[in-house]
Swiss-Prot record:
GO terms for cellular component: cytosolic large ribosomal subunit. NCBIfam families: rpmD_bact (TIGR01308). The lineage of its organism: Bacteria, Bacillati, Bacillota, Bacilli, Lactobacillales. SUPFAM superfamilies: Ribosomal protein L30p/L7e. Pfam families: Ribosomal_L30 (PF00327). It comes from the Bacteria. Gene3D superfamilies: Ribosomal protein L30, ferredoxin-like fold domain. Part of the 50S ribosomal subunit. PROSITE patterns: RIBOSOMAL_L30. It comes from Streptococcus pneumoniae serotype 2 (strain D39 / NCTC 7466). The keyword Ribonucleoprotein applies. Keywords: Ribonucleoprotein, Ribosomal protein. This is Large ribosomal subunit protein uL30. GO terms for biological process: translation. One of its GO terms (molecular function) is structural constituent of ribosome.
């Protein structure tokens, strides 16, 4: 299965609590931190919820 790299580009400060919890659940802490996750429906849904805070790119 493909993998994706998720990078936190904007701060979750001032966002609604569910968006802040989603950022933490993705494993992102500080700005510009990145994680590599499996590309599946659950992760894609989380990315959609915070798409204005993160950038996503595919990893080969």
């Amino acid at each position: 299965m493909a993998q994706i790299k998720i990078t936190l580009t904007k701060s979750p400060i001032g966002r609604i609590p569910s968006q802040r919890k989603t950022v933490v659940a993705l494993g992102l802490g500080k700005l510009n931190s990145s994680v590599i996750k499996e590309d599946n429906a659950a992760i894609r849904g989380m990315i959609t919820a915070v798409s204005h805070l993160v950038t996503v790119e595919e990893v080969n």
